[in-house]
């Protein structure tokens, strides 16, 4: 799973930016997140538990014309070969792409449609062995977005 996380970290590197001032770094570290990338334009952090691998990208992009959808499409087209695209859907909060890896694990790419901060886009890779159905997936998306948004000041 760690090898998959590394590949997915690279996949999230679509756009590059420095640790945003609107992120609560103390809270991130308190909740055991590791900083993966801290460059101007893109800030990536993640953590892995027994059940879930989570990688979050916070992007500061000036263009706002349907950028969340564009990011979601970029993740879909830029996925590694060992990640087979299964489906995509959207709910009121996010665009969600589902991938299945050769080892049977699932990766859910979650891109928030709206954020509290202008020009701030959130992209999440949620890796698990579970094959979520629509209602359950919506709950996971809401819970995950709520957690990530709680780190925004």
Annotate each language-model stretch with its function.
Residues 4-14:
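Sec-dependent N-terminal signal peptides
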Residues 17-45, 80-82, 89, 144-149:
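N-terminal "mature-domain start" segment
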Residues 29-33, 126-153:
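Surface-exposed amphipathic alpha-helical segments
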Residues 30-31, 47-49, 90-92, 113-121:
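Short, solvent-exposed coil/turn segments at beta-strand boundaries
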Residues 38-41, 53, 103-111, 120-121:
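Short, surface-exposed coil-to-beta transition loops
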Residues 45-70, 121-127:
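A short acidic-to-branched-hydrophobic micro-motif
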Residues 79-116:
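Signature of long, low-cysteine stretches enriched in small and polar/charged residues
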Residues 99-104, 113-140:
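Short, exposed beta-strand-loop hairpins at the edges of beta-sheets
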């Amino acid at each position: 799973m760690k090898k998959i996380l590394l590949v997915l970290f690279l996949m999230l590197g679509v756009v590059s930016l420095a640790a945003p001032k609107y992120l609560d770094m103390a809270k991130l570290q308190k909740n055991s997140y590791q900083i993966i990338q801290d460059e101007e334009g893109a800030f990536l952090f993640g953590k892995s538990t027994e059940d879930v691998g989570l990688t979050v990208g916070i992007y500061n992009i000036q263009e706002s014309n349907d950028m969340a959808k564009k990011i979601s499409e970029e993740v879909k087209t830029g996925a590694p070969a060992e990640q087979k695209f299964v489906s995509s859907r959207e709910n009121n909060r996010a665009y969600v792409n589902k991938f299945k890896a050769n080892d049977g694990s699932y990766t859910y790419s979650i891109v928030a449609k709206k954020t509290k901060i202008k020009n701030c886009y959130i992209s999440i890779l949620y890796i698990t062995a579970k094959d979520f159905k629509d209602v359950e997936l919506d709950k996971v998306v809401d819970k995950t977005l709520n957690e990530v948004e709680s780190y925004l000041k």
